[in-house]
Amino acid sequence: MTAPNRNTLWARALIDELVAAGVDAVVASPGSRSTPLTVAAARTDDLRVFSQLDERSAAYFALGRARRTGKVTPLICTSGTAAANYHPAVMEASEARVPLLALTADRPPELRDSGANQTADQEKLYGDAVRFYKDLPEPAPNDRALRSLRTTVARAVGTAEGADPGPVHLNVPFKKPLEPTRVLDDVPADLDPVAERGRDGPYVDVTPGSPEPGDDALRRLGNELMTTDRGLIVAGPADPPGLDAEAVTALSHATGFPILADPLSGVRFGGHTRVAPVIGAYDAYLSAEVAGEAGDADASDSWNDPEVVLRLGASPTSKRLRKYLAETGADQYQVDPAGRWREAEFAATDLVVAEPSRLCARLSRLVAGGDGDADWRAQWEDADRVAQEIHGRERDGDIPADDEPVEFHEGDALRVVADALPDPATLFVSNSMPVRDLDRFVGPTTTSVTALGNRGVSGIDGIVSSALGAGSATTDDLTLVVGDLALYHDTNGLLALDRCDVDATVVLINNDGGGIFHELPIESFEPEFTESFKTPHGIEFEPMADLHGLAYTRIDARPDSVESAGNVADDLADAYTGARDADGSHLIEVRTDAESSHRTRKRLEAAVDRAVHGDEAE
């Protein structure tokens, strides 16, 4: 059917081309100038439209969905500050390599720099954060313009999902009328059908690149792995859609190297952990100082250094692991499909341009039969077992060689939730302390868990929206573990529970402010610490749960409110299991004391260090 006007024709062609390129959902926010795009999306049968009121939340929702699927999720917004509100999520997508497409509607060019209402300079609005940018021409109802439009859209999607995935930006100007009203003689009746309606499939089929080392380079790397006794595979936070755990496991078996798996790598959790040496508690015993026993000496000095390290994904969450790797002196191969540098300690000796999972699969076939050093592998496995045992005993009220009362701490909350996750599950963790506690206190498990977080630029904004976006792309049960400040930053995101039909169990770790700053030297400087860093707020979250229709449970885990860590853990386990199995969404608020949790982390650190590097745990 002939379009009623050129804007409708243009928007319809753009949206059609997105669907042809494999897009199955868009996230749109209400606005006038974007009307042609929103209407075209709403009238497309093969496209799901998520309507989000707030553009910042919308962008993070799309980010979370794209992170979960590895496929581009377009955004649609009107002109002006609406487009600017996408910027934080675009920054995260750029650093974390998440495919996004920002479709920002705009006034026509003659109104720019004219004082016209709701008009700003949107050209290259996101700067170098996007992989591809195009300021589209005004809609033109002719064959050449439509072919150009379709080609540009196909290129944008192909770039967003390419070897170096990330956000792309198309700025789309429209004149009035913006609604699908008929304008006499605005659209010719004799348009080329291919230009008007597209081809079967994408107008331009963009074949993604697959960088791989040549045979000679692969043999050299394989030979070094095969002749190395003490090697490590370090799996950092993975680019969407994640590392292939089976391929990484196969390489571990072929070389005999243990896998140090970040919780966001896609390798720490899953059935492969039954047979692979997956190490997860390294943050508890690497580079730890034993207070009063080892002085300033690094406990990791007692370990032999690795000879070779194969690094996959982004830089690990664990600062201690990064420090350990920086000081080893080993040959370190940083694997990156786009040839970008992602290792801020500058300890890597080689940059291997390759897709990590495919490289692991090729290397595992090449070096099959390597054993590595059994004692070296056992050292890591034993240390991990000891750390997990001590963390488990602490839950039962027993820190080895420590006679002080045991207090429930925030890391316990992560362990309780992880132990009770269904199979399969999607777990989204906030930045600040939750992701660090997940890293240190939750070891490998056979449960199929997709663990996600925003570790690109590691902000605490947009966490709720990102989690719900991820939940919109899966039938898994969705759990979000979030801090109080991160939840406060993104309460608008909770609107998606109802508007986008997503259910979630939200576990809120409320320590009344910036608990992570207890981990930093600024803690010693008062009153600046409390007034400008800790920033206690006293917010009550139950009314917020009522506002957004979440069932609510409060668990008070502060030391002056409980008898033992075990009681709180049991209460949390019961609350989480009940919420998980119930219909709808649930907020479980766990009130904690940041200073107490900080002390308990330090006590556990010392206990693990004594057991792994010094005296045996009692």
Swiss-Prot record:
Pfam families: TPP_enzyme_M_2, TPP_enzyme_N. Its EC number is 2.2.1.9. Gene3D superfamilies: 3.40.50.970, TPP-binding domain. InterPro entries: DHS-like_NAD/FAD-binding_dom, MenaQ_synth_MenD, MenD_middle, THDP-binding, Thiamin_PyroP_enz_TPP-bd_dom. This is 2-succinyl-5-enolpyruvyl-6-hydroxy-3-cyclohexene-1-carboxylate synthase. Binds 1 thiamine pyrophosphate per subunit. Keywords: Magnesium, Manganese, Menaquinone biosynthesis, Metal-binding, Thiamine pyrophosphate, Transferase. GO terms for biological process: menaquinone biosynthetic process; organic acid metabolic process; sulfur compound biosynthetic process. It comes from the Archaea. It catalyses: isochorismate + 2-oxoglutarate + H(+) = 5-enolpyruvoyl-6-hydroxy-2-succinyl-cyclohex-3-ene-1-carboxylate + CO2. The keyword Manganese applies. It is an enzyme of class 2 (transferase). Belongs to the TPP enzyme family. MenD subfamily. Homodimer. Residues 192-215 are annotated as: Disordered. GO terms for molecular function: 2-succinyl-5-enolpyruvyl-6-hydroxy-3-cyclohexene-1-carboxylic-acid synthase activity; magnesium ion binding; manganese ion binding; thiamine pyrophosphate binding. Catalyzes the thiamine diphosphate-dependent decarboxylation of 2-oxoglutarate and the subsequent addition of the resulting succinic semialdehyde-thiamine pyrophosphate anion to isochorismate to yield 2-succinyl-5-enolpyruvyl-6-hydroxy-3-cyclohexene-1-carboxylate (SEPHCHC). Pathway: Quinol/quinone metabolism; 1,4-dihydroxy-2-naphthoate biosynthesis; 1,4-dihydroxy-2-naphthoate from chorismate: step 2/7; Quinol/quinone metabolism; menaquinone biosynthesis. Its cofactor is Mg(2+); Mn(2+); thiamine diphosphate.
